[in-house]
A protein has these predicted regions:
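An acidic, low-aromatic, low-complexity terminal/linker signal
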Residues: 1-130
């Protein structure tokens, strides 16, 4: 699934997506985990917010951002993403290449025209980022 933060396109595996909903303001909390400084309510659940926009030094775009709920190995977490609706893409395994960037943990990337779209390594979010 391809989404954007600050106009930059990123991807996650659809199996790692738990849902998309309107963004609601999070509740700030103290945390020693880099880029997790708040929590968000979704129904009865209280989930950590991973601030990928701050990590990438970007700002979420749009007046009505979306909440991307992802399945992290330690439990679901959410991210605020641009208001542009995410798009599903089907890729052949051969289309996935090594991500050359060093700005985020990625399981690989794929080419879309001249753009290289990184595929986030969800399991590494919040654990190794400083």
């Amino acid at each position: 699934m391809v989404f954007s933060i600050g106009g930059r396109r990123l991807a996650v595996k659809t199996l790692e997506v738990a849902g998309i909903s309107p963004w609601k303001p999070p509740i700030p909390v103290g945390s020693r985990t880099p880029f997790i400084t708040s929590v968000a309510r979704q129904g009865q659940a209280v989930l950590p917010v991973f601030d990928l926009a701050s990590f990438l030094r970007l700002r979420v775009q749009g007046n009505h951002p979306l909440c991307l709920r992802i399945k992290h190995p330690l439990g679901d977490m959410v991210m605020c993403i641009d208001e542009e609706m995410p798009v599903l893409h089907t890729l052949e395994p051969a289309a996935i290449q090594v991500y050359r960037g060093k700005d985020m943990p990625a399981e690989g990337s794929y080419a879309n025209g001249l753009d290289e779209i990184p595929i986030l390594a969800i399991s590494q979010l919040g654990s190794c980022m400083k």
